[in-house]
Amino acid sequence: MSLRSYMIYDEYNRKYISLYNYRTSFFSQQEKSLFDKIKSEIVSDDDFVIYGTDCKKYFLDYCILKNDLNVLDTLVLKYPWHAVIFDHSVSDFLVNSDGLVNIHQYILNFISANKIDHYEDILNYLLSHNIDISGHDNIAIMIAVQRKNLSMVKKLVEYGADIHANNDRALKLAVDDIEMFQYIVDMGADIHIDNDYCIRAATLIFNFDLLQFLVELGCDINIGNGYLLRTIINADFYYHRTITKNNVFEIVKYINVNSLGPHELTNCIHVHKNIELIKLLSDYGADFTFINKFCVMNEYEENVVDILKNHGLKYESILKFVLKYQSFMH
């Protein structure tokens, strides 16, 4: 195969433009005009040969990006694509047993790997051509779940897509979308998959609505010897403010607070300064007695306290000063 078969000719500048290492996300105006010219002149498969074998693949990419479904239909249905297997970027599993490229799988892979706002149109296009939407590890429904498109997920299920494929992977993809998650659970997904992955993930992304939903369904909130609560308590200040806003205290009531150590409890006092949470943890049995040992005064500190008391300072004022100092040091 000649080098020219991987190029298209720019008649205006009288030179060939290579498409071999071309990246579809960076179509220049010049390439766009050339693609428009090609599109207007497609009357037979021979036209692709004139412009180069590799042009087929990139023209397909371009049609997907531009949502040009009419031309996409022409490319997929009317012309053989056997020559595109010479393109090294097409994986072997995209080639059917007869040596032809699986175009539908290629399209699904392409929209999965690229952020395409109109992907729903393309999925509908594939459905309209009666393809096996559950094939290739159910990539179509995984795309819809990742894009948080519940209506498309339901439609794909109606067409035979398996919402439970790959060990309920769709459920794990939906941990940041409570509505999608609830739908998949209603379809029979296992909320305990992969050692309670869902409740762990919900904790890490601070999805408290999902946390409460999972607890109500029977997930073990004390999983990992207090992993959930320790993760929340050790969160940075921004997320800790979110805790109060999302009423996570209802969840804390069911947690064994004895899993918290001095590090977490010190964070509550000095870093987060969340008085509601400190009170709640104390009411539910958190052990703050480490402070007694931590705050044992040496001779110098006792002398300082005595001097301050003799000058009329109250214990409350001295304590407030110490707390402010500790807060500053943190």
UniProtKB/Swiss-Prot annotation:
Protein origin, superkingdom: Viruses
InterPro entries according to UniProt: Ankyrin_rpt, Ankyrin_rpt-contain_sf
Gene3D superfamilies with a match to the protein in the record = Ankyrin repeat-containing domain
Keywords (alphabetical) are: ANK repeat, Repeat
ANK repeats mapped onto the chain: 55-84, 103-135, 136-165, 167-193, 195-223, 260-290
Keyword Mitochondrion on this protein? no
* A Pfam family assignment: Ank_2
Report what the protein is called: Putative ankyrin repeat protein L121
